């Protein structure tokens, strides 16, 4: 049975790329045509890439490898947290802090601080502090939970990183390259497939497209560890809008 169908990719808008003037020529092998000034991604090739990525991820998960999911754009943030949690992986979905991987010793110190503050909150120790001090500590706790909550159980560097939007997450890509950590990435027509190890061409701006691809990768990890994956719940799209162009400017 196919990992992904052309019909579900069409329905999710996986085939819509960026405006032709904003493309990266290195994505040419994955582009089918252009319509009304917008590149259309070749879904046959996307299906092949999803199949390759699924099997690569599943094989590595079966070997006990650990994965970090990265997607900080608004359309991807909620999906990244949901799917990474479902398959027992780590995630970054707010902001990539410089040195997240290359300066892991320092970042781990902040993670340890997060755990310390959470213990203080759980045991009631925070409530015993002077009101002003407690307020400062709670603000610190909230900030650490926001940026590091998805990796608080990560004891060492991940074995592989799954990235949504290579262009936007270029800092994460550079750190992975520096450390030799394999990258699985969803790539829109403005991205560079040469800087990742396992490319998946697809619309990385539409929520349904991101959800479809990320859920397949999460399924691969879940099935490697637990057997058949449960049917994925429908993502709540309220408060998260599809965008086809705006976020590319930020990268």
UniProtKB/Swiss-Prot annotation:
Q: Which UniProt keywords apply?
A: Ribonucleoprotein, Ribosomal protein
Q: Does the keyword Disulfide bond apply?
A: no
The GO terms this record gives for MF are: structural constituent of ribosome
* A matching Pfam family: Ribosomal_S2
GO cellular component terms listed in the entry, alphabetical order:
cytosolic small ribosomal subunit
Instruction: Enumerate the InterPro entries for this protein.
Output: Ribosomal_uS2, Ribosomal_uS2_bac/mit/plastid, Ribosomal_uS2_CS, Ribosomal_uS2_flav_dom_sf
Which spans are transmembrane here? none
Which GO biological process categories is it annotated with?
Answer: translation
User: What CDD domains has UniProt attached to this entry?
Assistant: RPS2
Q: Which Gene3D superfamilies match?
A: Glucose-6-phosphate isomerase like protein, domain 1 (3.40.50.10490), Helix hairpin bin (1.10.287.610)
Name the protein family: Belongs to the universal ribosomal protein uS2 family.
Q: What is this protein called?
A: Small ribosomal subunit protein uS2
Q: What is the lineage of its organism?
A: Bacteria, Bacillati, Cyanobacteriota, Cyanophyceae, Synechococcales
């Amino acid at each position: 049975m196919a990992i992904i169908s052309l019909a579900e990719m069409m329905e999710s808008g996986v085939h819509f790329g960026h405006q032709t003037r904003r493309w990266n020529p290195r994505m040419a092998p994955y582009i089918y045509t252009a319509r009304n000034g917008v590149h259309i991604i070749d879904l046959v090739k996307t299906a092949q890439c999803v199949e390759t990525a699924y099997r690569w991820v599943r094989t590595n998960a079966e070997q006990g490898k650990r994965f970090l999911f990265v997607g900080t754009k608004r359309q991807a943030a909620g999906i990244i947290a949901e799917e990474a949690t479902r398959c027992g992986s780590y995630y970054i979905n707010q902001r990539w802090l410089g040195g997240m991987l290359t300066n892991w010793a320092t970042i781990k110190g902040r993670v340890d601080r997060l755990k310390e503050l959470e213990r203080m909150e759980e045991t009631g120790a925070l409530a015993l502090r002077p009101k002003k001090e407690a307020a400062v500590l709670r603000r610190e706790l909230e900030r650490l939970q926001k940026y590091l909550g998805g990796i608080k159980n990560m004891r060492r560097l991940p074995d592989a990183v799954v990235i949504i939007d290579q262009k936007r997450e270029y800092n994460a890509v550079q750190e992975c390259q520096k450390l030799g950590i394999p990258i699985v990435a969803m790539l829109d027509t403005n991205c560079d497939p040469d800087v990742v190890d396992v490319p998946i061409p697809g619309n990385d701006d539409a929520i349904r497209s991101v959800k479809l691809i990320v859920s397949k990768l999460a399924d691969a990890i879940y099935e490697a560890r637990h057997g058949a994956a449960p049917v994925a719940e429908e993502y709540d799209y309220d408060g998260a809008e599809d965008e086809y162009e705006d976020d590319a400017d930020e990268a």
